[in-house]
A protein has these predicted regions:
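A short aromatic-anchored loop/beta-hairpin motif
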Residues: 1-99, 103-108
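Internal, conserved structured core segments that host functional sites
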Residues: 94-154
Length: 154
């Protein structure tokens, strides 16, 4: 299956209610927009979310495609924290690298920790965690979607 849905999403910590602190009401509109975005995406039932983050791994003149088994991160604000852990779609990540190469784009698979298993886990930045907080675990699904993280070249 190809691309079934595409969107741009904000990534300010205050849109997650637990991290909003005194800004809960001020970010209500943005939070509501993210909830609507998640609902719209869920209607298309993607099995994997490909997320391009401006705040993750920074590679000079190279696109990075995360090939770890997992990605996880913790975000702290106003004395509180949230944590997320997702399984990565390694097969799709390899396909993206292959297609990029065929298109003469420089893309590398990047791993962290171990080559496989629970310790094969890329640290998750806030530009990934915050959108996935809303998009990655729709209310009606029993399991989280898989993800592929892509980092732009610098």
């Amino acid at each position: 299956m190809g691309i079934v849905y595409a969107c741009l999403a904000p990534h300010g910590a205050e849109i997650i209610p637990k991290l909003a602190g005194k800004q809960l009401e001020a970010f209500g509109g943005t939070r509501g927009g993210m909830e609507r975005l998640a609902k719209a995406m869920d209607e298309h039932r993607p099995s994997t979310i490909v997320i391009a983050t401006p705040h993750g791994l920074r590679l000079d003149r190279t696109i990075g495609v995360v090939t770890t088994e997992y990605s996880e991160g913790t975000l702290k604000a106003h004395g509180r924290s949230v944590r997320a852990r997702f399984r990565c779609d390694r097969q799709l990540a390899q396909k993206i690298i292959q297609k990029a190469s065929q298109a003469k784009l420089t893309a590398l698979g990047v791993n962290y920790g171990t080559s496989e298993g629970p310790s094969s886990c890329m640290p998750m930045d806030w530009g990934t965690l915050i959108p996935l907080w809303f998009l990655g675990t729709p209310q009606k699904r029993k399991r989280k979607r898989r993800i592929v993280i892509v980092t732009p070249s610098r």
